[in-house]
Design a protein with these regions (language model features):
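A charged amphipathic helix-loop-strand protein-protein interaction module that recurs
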Residues: 5-35
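A broadly tuned preference for mixed-charge, low-complexity surface segments
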Residues: 27-47, 104-116
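Juxtadomain coupling helices with adjacent low-complexity linkers
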Residues: 69-116
Length: 116
């Protein structure tokens, strides 16, 4: 039963932070105090280890997340990616736009210029 909780925590970390869980782990290592405070605010359990991936459609929009556990974090990531691709979807790594790779997919608006 613990495996299910770990997988859920990886998926939740990816979905709530908008990036693969391995990048959330990296951010935790870079800014531990910030991430500790952020995790206190989270609505669910985040498990910070590789294996949580965002599921994206062809346009790069997030449509869900998956968490995989049972092997090393790196192999869990490989399995998550394989499952996403087998289902016909995409991961952050399938896009070259840096905003999508970081887990952000925003539609940029043109700057509004107001004149007096």
């Amino acid at each position: 039963m613990l495996f299910r909780s770990i997988a859920y925590g990886k998926a939740y970390a990816a979905l709530s932070m908008g990036r693969p869980s391995r990048l959330v782990l990296q951010k935790q290592r870079e800014k531990p105090v910030f991430m500790e405070n952020l995790m206190d605010l989270a609505d669910g359990p985040m498990f910070l280890e590789a294996g949580g991936q965002l599921i994206r459609d062809a346009a790069g929009e997030v449509i869900g997340a998956i968490g995989v556990t049972g092997d090393t974090g790196e192999m869990d990531d490989v399995c998550a990616t394989a499952g996403i691709h087998a289902a016909g979807h995409k991961t952050c790594a399938d896009f070259t736009d840096p905003k999508v790779i970081r887990g952000i997919n925003v539609k940029e608006a043109k700057p509004q210029i107001s004149t007096p």
